[in-house]
Swiss-Prot record:
HAMAP family: IF_2_A (MF_00100_A). The keyword Nuclease applies. One of its GO terms (molecular function) is GTP binding. Residues 391-608 form the tr-type G domain. GO terms for cellular component: cytoplasm. It comes from Pyrococcus furiosus (strain ATCC 43587 / DSM 3638 / JCM 8422 / Vc1). This is Probable translation initiation factor IF-2. This protein undergoes a protein self splicing that involves a post-translational excision of the intervening region (intein) followed by peptide ligation. The intein interrupts the GTP-binding site. The keyword Protein biosynthesis applies.
Length: 984
């Protein structure tokens, strides 16, 4: 039986850079030290994009941020941005800490999730990292110290601390042991141990300097204070006092200190406790527990509830225990004697033991790595000028000692905020969201009536690819998994590198798409009415706002034309098969979302009907979006099923790194409608079957080696299993390659990304030796090293959306193996090609400096042009063919050497080269006119075999016709003695 499935819609967009900071905000980079964002931008030389409003530069340096597990660590900062801004900025002052000024959209990690600066309130708590990373390379610092005339020893740094006689910026480039000596000197000289804290006069960057040791201090006007058990112990361990009285006072202070920082994360602890079977009464958590209390609570939660079995029995109705019934009712699990939705979900979690230490570890990491301080003041200011931003691999970084984040269209459709739901909110993977047709009708109802549209689809399945790189993972039988795509473009910023990359990928996969021109709300004077269709909202605007919108739309239309697309505003499109439809929207306020949904549904229905017809009962086929470990389930795969029906207990064949994996579905977990497949806990329904098109999490044994981007095929019979294995291995082997031929080594995060990178390289004629999925390893570097010995231009590694393992980084640096990593394919290849060109030019310059060019000269027959007969002989000559340079040896017609050209002169000027047709005077060392050389005689430049090979093999493009003639003439002379020259 065939039916129409819901279309799969991929949402692509460029990195959002409406979230920026003032130019004077500071960041710490181990390689550079403490710099302002403006200084960082100026240090980055390679321009990626530049226009009137913005400039993007490639950075590629390490910067402190927070990873997806909640750990403070060094992250790769890919780009630094500068954007023109006119309007409101938000200055956030943190109590006892620094302030930072950002655009209103810039989010902060708070005790209530990621919150935009414009929505922050006094009393909110925002995250401060417990440490920042500086330089630990002593050899590197020694060079810097030498340039600055500083001795790089602890004694000098201790004395500098006592007198503050050193540039403070140097301290962020100095290794920890020297910084420790500096701080010890400063605290010995100026520090006072009070009853509850250490106190010292404040200098500007002292709190950031202390963060290098995990010490969080407090700023009070012109004083800095260190208090709390954890901070005091870290101070004693890493800094301490040389002064014995102060050291003793510190020991006493620590012995009395019982508490460290307090953490306002009550709701997160309650959620975690409930997951492990604890009610709030059992845990009895105070409002803001201290670090010490929190650690005890987490240990208790990790051990699990001792009476979980009784609670399960109560929820299942097997026992009736009044006390438990009352408590579970208070927790919202039971209402009017029946299980609530939360109760049903939690019962499944408890029954299946879907929790383990990893859930606790995330919160523990947050507590170990971050401190939450209260917002003292939120101030709105007007600003005109450039604002700056940095793109890191997890889209967050530390500025002014505060964690800031860059983070959307699907959120508006879902009417949820995924980032706020995630405790860390720092993931950038593909997610899938099912939007039922009822929701589409609810959002776009008035428009559907107005347009007399009828939507027959069961719904829309959106796949959120936060970057174009994720789209390449959406593979289905060599094409794209997506039926349709939405390309999100900031109408104010226009095309970005990611936009261009996305267009190229959509073109390559032949995926039809519509354009969402986002952020119309930022057009000056735009009147906002939330969730209003664009066509109605546009009627509220004055002529100036409409004119600005039209100008920006025409700029976009012009850009699309450059890429070979006819485009127009959606309501002006005459033929949707020939023109791109652009829908002006505001994802933030929901304006235009109605038109976008109706357009997607209408186009899918009209033009993709045949593609959407599927055999419902047939075996399922799908594509892996992500492989991840889930508490209680082990390794799972997030899959988009695009054909057939998948059942619990079905045998499936999955693409693995080295082989096809055959396993049995143990559980199918389906996100609720409008929920996203990577949402946190309480999101999944356990189902017995799932029919295309749908996003589903599959739990099954042996999925550790499953490859993101590879196929999933249900195989009901042994014959079908073998057939599926063959098909999957064919697909993988067509992408993952390992050969002995000359070529570059490429790595990518998924099979689809690898395929896209391979295709681009092949189209450019760049050979590939090895293509594989995964991070760049030591083995990859060693292989590139062996290639380099044969052909240096291919002895490189190109990595797309992957990391470089530490040991690989060290060897590559030591051996000089170039590694190119990034998340824009065309930019990666451009970087590689630019490097090859630079290396070739460098090699050419080296060869040109060494090689001898061929030349033929004739001495003037007139004795008047003999200016000196010997020591050296100076004569007037004409260059007949080729060229001559000082240092070349001259030979006669019979091959006899006559001397070396010492210098070349034209009138009063000495020349480094003379070419065909030039008349010059040459000084010939070792020749006597009348004995060795004679007026009117022809002489030839003596070149070696190696010179001839170098010229013809490596420098052919710089040889002029005259050089080649000279080479042939000289070859004829030399061929009398050496047959090698006959071939020239």
């Amino acid at each position: 039986m065939k039916k129409i499935r819901q279309p799969i819609i991929a949402v692509l967009g460029h990195v959002d850079h409406g979230k920026c900071l003032l130019p004077e905000e500071k960041v710490v980079l181990p390689e550079i030290g403490l710099v302002t964002l403006r200084e960082l931008f100026e240090l980055a030389n390679e321009v990626v994009v530049k226009d009137e409003e913005k400039e993007v530069r490639k950075l590629g340096k390490m910067l402190t941020g927070v990873d997806e597990r909640g750990n403070v660590k060094l992250l790769n900062a890919l780009y630094v941005w500068r954007v023109a801004h006119k309007g409101e900025m938000i200055r956030v002052k943190v109590n006892g800490w620094y302030s930072v000024t950002v655009t209103p959209e810039h989010p902060f990690l708070t005790n209530r999730g990621w919150v935009k600066a414009g929505e922050l309130k006094e009393g909110d708590y925002i995250a401060i990292p417990r440490r920042v990373y500086g330089n630990e390379d002593l050899m590197k610092f020694s060079k810097i110290a030498k340039e600055l005339g500083i001795k790089g020893d602890e004694k000098e740094f201790y004395l500098a601390g006592a007198s503050l006689d050193i540039p403070i910026k140097v301290l962020f480039l100095a290794p920890s042991k020297l910084v420790s000596a500096f701080l010890r000197g400063y605290f010995d000289a100026k520090g006072v141990v009070r009853e509850n804290y250490i106190e010292v006069p404040l200098f500007e960057d002292l709190p950031l300097l202390l963060l290098r040791f995990g010490i969080v201090s407090r700023i009070e006007k012109s004083t800095l204070k260190i208090s709390g058990k954890r901070n005091l112990e870290l101070f004693r361990k890493h800094v301490g006092f040389t002064d014995s009285e102060k050291a003793k006072a510190l020991d006493e202070l620590i012995s009395k200190a019982k508490e460290s920082e307090r953490y306002p994360i009550l709701e997160e602890l309650r959620r975690l406790g409930l997951l492990f079977g604890f009610t709030r009464n059992e845990l009895r958590i105070e409002e803001n527990p201290t670090y010490e209390v929190l650690m005890e609570i987490l240990e208790r939660i990790e051990r699990g509830s001792p009476n979980l079995a009784e609670k399960i029995a109560v929820l299942e109705g097997r026992i009736k225990e009044e006390n438990y019934l009352r408590i579970l009712e208070e927790e919202g699990l039971i209402e009017n004697g029946k299980l609530t939705e939360l109760g049903k979900e939690l019962l499944e979690v408890w029954r299946n033991r879907e929790f383990d230490s990893k859930d606790v570890d995330y919160v523990r990491n947050i507590v170990e790595n971050l401190v939450f301080l209260p917002v003292e003041k939120v101030e709105r200011i007007e600003y005109e000028g450039y604002v700056y931003d940095v793109t890191t691999e997890t889209h967050n970084f530390v500025a002014n000692g505060i964690l800031v984040h860059n983070t959307t269209l699907l959120d508006r459709i879902r009417k949820t905020n995924v980032a706020a739901k995630e405790a860390g909110g720092i993931t950038q993977h593909i997610g899938a969201t099912e939007v039922p047709i009822d929701v589409v009708k609810e959002i776009a109802g008035p428009l559907i009536k107005l347009w007399k549209a009828e939507i027959k689809l069961p719904g829309l399945l959106f796949i959120d690819t936060p970057g174009h790189e994720a789209f390449t993972s959406l593979r289905a039988r060599g094409g794209s998994l997506a039926d349709l795509a939405v390309l999100v473009v900031d109408i104010n910023e226009g095309f970005q590198p990611q936009t261009i990359e996305s267009i190229e990928i959509l073109r390559r996969y032949k995926t039809p798409f519509v354009v969402a021109a986002n952020k119309i709300d930022r057009i000056k004077g735009w009147v906002i009415q939330e969730d209003e269709p664009f066509l109605l909202n546009s009627k509220r605007q004055d002529q100036r706002a409409i004119q600005e919108l039209e100008t920006k739309l025409w700029e976009l239309i012009g850009k699309f034309y450059e890429f070979g697309f006819q485009a127009n505003r959606f309501d002006r499109v005459q033929n949707f098969t020939r023109e791109l439809a652009i829908v002006p929207i505001s994802a933030k306020y929901g304006i235009g979302i109605a038109e976008l949904l109706v357009l997607i549904a209408g186009l899918s229905q009209k033009y993709l009907e045949e593609r959407l017809k599927i055999e419902v009962e047939g075996p399922a086929r799908g594509t892996i979006l992500e492989v991840r470990e889930e508490p209680g389930l082990g390794h799972t795969i997030d899959v988009i099923i695009y054909e057939g029906t998948l059942h619990k207990d079905d045998t499936i064949v999955v693409g693995g790194k080295d082989k096809a994996i055959v396993t049995k579905v143990r559980a199918l977990l389906k996100p609720k409608p409008l929920d996203e497949i990577r949402d946190p806990r309480f999101r999944f329904d356990y189902v017995d079957e799932v029919t295309a098109a749908a996003g589903v999490k599959i739990a099954a044994p042996g999925l550790e080696e499953a490859l993101a981007g590879s196929p999933v095929i249900a195989a009901p019979t042994p014959e079908a299993v073998e057939k599926a294995k063959e098909e999957i291995m064919r697909q993988i082997q067509s992408v993952v390659i390992s050969t002995d031929k000359m070529g570059v080594i490429i790595k990518a995060d998924t099979l689809g990304s690898l395929e896209a990178l391979s295709k681009e390289l092949q189209e450019k004629g760049i050979p590939i030796r090895k293509a594989d999925v995964g991070n760049i390893s030591k083995t990859d570097v060693m292989e590139a090293l062996s290639v380099r010995e044969e052909d240096p231009k291919y002895g490189v590694i190109i990595g797309f959306n992957v990391k470089v393992n530490e040991d690989a980084q060290e060897i590559a640096k030591a051996k000089g193996v170039p590694i190119f990593v990034g998340n824009i394919i065309y930019k990666l290849i451009e970087d590689y090609e630019a490097w090859v060109k630079e290396e070739e030019e460098k090699k050419k310059r080296e060869l040109l400096a060494k090689v001898t060019f061929p030349g033929v000269i004739r001495l003037y027959p007139d004795e008047r042009y003999v200016f000196r007969r010997s020591n050296p002989a100076i004569v007037g000559i004409e260059v007949i063919e080729g060229r001559i340079k000082p240092g070349v040896t001259l030979i006669k017609q019979n091959g006899q050497k006559v001397g070396t050209i010492k210098s070349i002169k034209s009138r009063d000027e000495f020349l480094q080269e003379a070419k065909k047709g030039q008349a010059v005077a040459v000084a010939i060392e070792g020749a006597i006119v009348g004995r060795h050389i004679h007026p009117g005689e022809t002489l030839y430049v003596d070149i070696s075999r190696d010179d001839a090979i170098t010229l013809l093999k490596y420098l052919r493009d710089v040889l002029e016709d005259s050089d080649i003639k000279a080479l042939k003439i000289i070859a004829q002379i030399k061929a009398k003695e050496d047959p090698f020259w006959r071939a020239i």
